[in-house]
């Protein structure tokens, strides 16, 4: 079966400290503003 990737995006990450927070919540991609 062809499996497509699933992206769990952290939206509006505006500080470096937020990266760890969102990754710990399960995000596997980061979108910055």
UniProtKB/Swiss-Prot annotation:
Post-translational modification: Contains 2 disulfide bonds.
Entry's EC annotation: 4.6.1.-
Binding locations of Mg(2+): 31, 33
Compartments it resides in: Secreted
Cofactor stoichiometry and binding remark: Binds 1 Mg(2+) ion per subunit.
UniProt GO BP: killing of cells of another organism; lipid catabolic process
GO MF annotation list: lyase activity; metal ion binding; phosphoric diester hydrolase activity; toxin activity
Disulfide bonds: none
Superkingdom of origin organism: Eukaryota
Gene Ontology CC terms, in alphabetical order: extracellular region
Cofactor requirement: Mg(2+)
Keyword terms, alphabetized: Cytolysis, Dermonecrotic toxin, Disulfide bond, Hemolysis, Lipid degradation, Lipid metabolism, Lyase, Magnesium, Metal-binding, Secreted, Toxin
Tissue expression remark: Expressed by the venom gland.
Catalytic activity, reaction form: an N-(acyl)-sphingosylphosphocholine = an N-(acyl)-sphingosyl-1,3-cyclic phosphate + choline; an N-(acyl)-sphingosylphosphoethanolamine = an N-(acyl)-sphingosyl-1,3-cyclic phosphate + ethanolamine; a 1-acyl-sn-glycero-3-phosphocholine = a 1-acyl-sn-glycero-2,3-cyclic phosphate + choline; a 1-acyl-sn-glycero-3-phosphoethanolamine = a 1-acyl-sn-glycero-2,3-cyclic phosphate + ethanolamine
Main localization (coarse): secreted
Active site as annotated: 11
Uppermost EC category: lyase
Family per similarity comment: Belongs to the arthropod phospholipase D family. Class II subfamily.
Function: Dermonecrotic toxins cleave the phosphodiester linkage between the phosphate and headgroup of certain phospholipids (sphingolipid and lysolipid substrates), forming an alcohol (often choline) and a cyclic phosphate. This toxin acts on sphingomyelin (SM) with high activity (9.5 U/mg). It may also act on ceramide phosphoethanolamine (CPE), lysophosphatidylcholine (LPC) and lysophosphatidylethanolamine (LPE), but not on lysophosphatidylserine (LPS), and lysophosphatidylglycerol (LPG). It acts by transphosphatidylation, releasing exclusively cyclic phosphate products as second products.
Name of protein: Dermonecrotic toxin LbSicTox-alphaIB1b
Organism of origin: Loxosceles boneti (North American fiddleback spider)
Upper taxonomic lineage: Eukaryota, Metazoa, Ecdysozoa, Arthropoda, Chelicerata
């Amino acid at each position: 079966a062809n499996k497509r990737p699933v992206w769990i995006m952290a939206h509006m990450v505006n500080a470096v400290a937020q990266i760890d927070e969102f990754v710990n919540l399960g995000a596997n991609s980061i979108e910055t503003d």
